[in-house]
Each structure stands twice: as C-alpha cells, then as structure tokens.
Amino acid sequence: MAKKKSTAKRYKMHVKKGDTVQVIAGKDKAKVGEVIDVLPKLSQVVVEGVNMKTKHVKPRSESESGQISTVEFPIHSSNVMLYSNKENVASRVCYTFDDSGRKVRMLKKTGEIID
C-alpha cells in the first residue's frame, strides 16, 4: 500500500507581520516587540529582541573569519498577545466589521482597531 502524503497543516494566526506583541509566557515574559516573521505551518512567530540565541557562523572562504552572532529564534504564537502602544496593555483579539463592511481585527480590552 502506498503511504499518504502528509501535508503540513496551516494554523490560523491571530498576529501578522508588523504587529506589536507582548510575550506572556516563557523566559522572555513581559517583553514587547514587533513581529518580524510569521510561520503558519509551525504556528510560530519571530519577535524582535525576543528568544535571542548565539549562532556560530563558519567562514565561507579561507580569507574570511568565523564569527558569533545573536539571532532571534521563533516562539509559539500562543505565547504572544497583541499589544496596544496607546494604552500600554496587552489584549486578546476579536474580529468585527467596520462601517464599510470590511472584516477587521480589534483589541478586546481597548476596542482599538488594528487593521
């Protein structure tokens, strides 16, 4: 019998690239940063200045020297909450319709529309 191809599931993400989020769990709890990258197949996000790890880079040519650099690594999307810069508070997100009938994201605590 032939094996079924396993297709990676794409998770619905409540954050988008460019959103300001606050980390709510883990070693970087309470840190605020901007979402750099979204990985929906893994349900993870990369946040600026969060989950920093040191990476040892090998030299590509003989004349070049190796180096140690710090890079942001992804964290699970359930560990971040959208953050309001106006009110300085993190909040869950809900979906609502604006006056023109377009579906937009809104912060539950403040009522601030994100999109």
From Swiss-Prot:
Q: Which family does it belong to?
A: Belongs to the universal ribosomal protein uL24 family.
Quote the function comment for this protein: One of two assembly initiator proteins, it binds directly to the 5'-end of the 23S rRNA, where it nucleates assembly of the 50S subunit.
Matching entries from SUPFAM superfamilies are given as: Translation proteins SH3-like domain
Q: Which InterPro entries match?
A: KOW (IPR005824), Rib_uL2_dom2 (IPR014722), Ribosomal_uL24 (IPR003256), Ribosomal_uL24_KOW (IPR041988), Translation_prot_SH3-like_sf (IPR008991)
What GO biological process, any one, is recorded here?
Answer: translation
Quote the subunit structure annotation.
Part of the 50S ribosomal subunit.
Which GO terms fall under molecular function for this chain's record? rRNA binding; structural constituent of ribosome
- Pfam families recorded for this chain? KOW, ribosomal_L24
Gene assigned in the entry? rplX
Keywords for this entry?
Answer: Ribonucleoprotein, Ribosomal protein, RNA-binding, rRNA-binding
Return the protein name: Large ribosomal subunit protein uL24
GO cellular component terms, A-Z: ribonucleoprotein complex; ribosome
